[in-house]
């Protein structure tokens, strides 16, 4: 017996305990044999869910008969669209980032889908505080648990909360998944913390509830989204009929808004639009519609402070995260800051200006390379993004950096012997690694990265009051200007203004060291 704690196929499940009831065997539409234990383990607004005997997948049957268009969409999602994503080069990579239906099954006048069960790290290992007083240990890590400072501080065991580095990894994976979905011409339409699972402890993420994906112009959305994540133009026109040409429905551009909100919430644990401004004191529904729609305003707008959060009205559980003076969005560094501005200032009411998932992915990759461990061992966040200042300070606990801090400025070749700045830096800390994508600009860390490219090729170490790069697998490592070859197994010292070549191939990198001392 075990408690069923899946939510991969609908909303608001009531869960029950599995008894080993009858095992039902049936065929999928494409001829595969599937089995399920004939006892409902989860029932939501759309489906009833059953475990397979080995619990490696679930079978979810829709409550209501599906019309022809809905059946066609399910067939396409489990068929062609799934093949286009998982059947391509690097397709295996996406199995960890999507809980994607694999088959359609019809049995006893019911239609359903077969969906993989969640990975073990998407279930709470420790649960809530005070010996799991909420009883959530073993339940799935729905993204909403982690999206507000108040939720985390009030309820979650500190071991479940993660830190700045793991949340950057979570955001990177979510962004990568959305990028792939959009590249296939699909949009989620309900991208929110209710439809993602995240594991902040290790930095995992997965998009769920994909059986309702929207194909613009072919399959319309079943829902307009989840409050907090619906784009302002969708909220603003929600009173209009779906047939009205002025009605804005979910699309890839509205997904971009939802993705930006998710990233902001997972990095700052607050909502970018929920501030102190009230638009209608007498009508709460109208006030909400204006705040999230026509009158939506970034709480950190640089010139219009009317929606700024009123710190005096905040619960202590929300602090310091809700205090915009202490933790502004700019602490995330030079790559994410302009994207937040495009998402919530320039693009909030102009969808064409919103950052794409590709742009978020690129900025997050560069930001992860700017991460620096806090020297205060008691710092809850443990890491922070290097600000570019000569006297860096952890924005979370206020601890200044002490000692020598090497920053590697990356340049790459467009033609042999000619290097241009890449607007990309790599912070150095003891144990920090160099990978193939640092050696060569033409290699990107994504689903196409080979196993060989995922292996580190060098690492940094602080020894005898000096910083060193140890060469583990860089064949072309060469110091300048003496052009001395640094063989595998040897090391090169990182001194101020030192230069060395990582690769002379096309796209190969040149490094210029900047040494900050405090």
Map each language-model feature to its residues.
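ATP-binding glycine-rich loop module of kinase domains
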Residues: 37-38, 45-104, 109-112, 119-161
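Catalytic-loop of the protein kinase fold
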Residues: 178, 182-200
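N-terminal beta-hairpin/loop module of FHA
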Residues: 407-459
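C-terminal boundary/linker segments immediately following FHA domains
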Residues: 479-518
């Amino acid at each position: 017996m075990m408690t069923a704690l899946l939510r991969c196929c609908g909303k608001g499940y009531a869960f029950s305990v599995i008894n080993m009831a009858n095992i039902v065997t049936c065929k999928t539409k494409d001829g595969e044999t599937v089995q399920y234990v004939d006892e409902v383990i989860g029932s939501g607004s759309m489906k009833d869910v059953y475990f397979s005997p080995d619990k490696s997948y679930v079978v979810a049957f829709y409550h209501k008969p599906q019309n022809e268009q809905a059946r066609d969409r399910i067939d396409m999602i489990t068929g062609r669209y799934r093949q286009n994503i998982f059947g391509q080069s690097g397709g295996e990579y996406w199995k960890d980032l999507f809980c994607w239906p694999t088959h359609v099954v019809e049995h006893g006048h019911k239609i359903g889908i077969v969906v993989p069960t969640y990975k073990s790290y998407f279930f709470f290992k420790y649960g809530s505080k005070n010996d799991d007083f909420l009883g959530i240990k073993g339940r799935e890590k729905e993204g909403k648990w982690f999206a507000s400072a108040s939720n985390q501080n009030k309820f979650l065991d500190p071991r479940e909360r993660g830190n700045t580095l793991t949340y950057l990894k979570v955001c990177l994976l979510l962004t990568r998944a959305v990028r792939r979905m959009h590249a296939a011409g699909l949009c989620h339409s309900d991208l929110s913390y209710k439809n993602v699972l995240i594991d902040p402890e290790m930095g995992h993420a997965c998009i769920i509830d994909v059986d309702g994906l929207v194909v613009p112009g072919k399959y319309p959305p079943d829902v307009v989204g989840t409050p907090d994540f619906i784009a302002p133009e969708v909220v603003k026109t929600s009173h209009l009929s779906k047939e009205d040409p002025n009605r804005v429905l979910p699309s890839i551009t509205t997904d971009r808004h939802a993705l930006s909100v998710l990233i902001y919430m997972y990095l700052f644990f607050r909502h970018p639009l929920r501030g102190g401004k009230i638009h209608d004191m007498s009508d709460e529904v109208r006030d909400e519609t204006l705040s999230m729609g026509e009158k939506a305003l970034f709480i950190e707008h640089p010139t219009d402070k009317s929606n700024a959060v009123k710190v005096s009205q905040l619960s202590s559980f929300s602090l310091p995260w809700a205090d915009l003076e202490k933790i502004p969005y700019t602490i995330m560094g030079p790559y994410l800051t302009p994207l937040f501005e495009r998402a919530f200032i320039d693009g909030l009411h102009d969808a064409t200006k919103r950052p794409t998932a590709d742009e978020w992915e690129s900025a997050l990759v560069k930001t992860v390379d700017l991460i620096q461990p806090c020297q205060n061992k008691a710092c809850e966040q443990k890491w922070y993004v290097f600000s570019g200042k000569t006297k860096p300070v952890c924005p979370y606990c206020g601890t200044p950096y002490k000692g020598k801090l090497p920053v590697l400025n990356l340049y790459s070749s467009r033609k042999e012997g000619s290097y241009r700045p890449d607007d990309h830096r790599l912070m150095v800390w003891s144990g920090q690694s160099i990978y193939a994508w640092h050696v060569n600009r033409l290699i990107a860390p994504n689903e196409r990265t080979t196993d060989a490219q995922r292996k580190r090729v060098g690492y940094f170490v602080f020894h005898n009051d000096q910083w060193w790069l140890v060469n583990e697998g860089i064949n072309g490592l060469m110091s300048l200007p003496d052009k001395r070859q640094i063989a595998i197994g040897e090391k090169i010292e990182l001194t101020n203004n030192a230069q060395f070549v990582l690769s002379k191939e096309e796209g190969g990198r040149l490094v210029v060291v900047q040494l900050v001392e405090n």
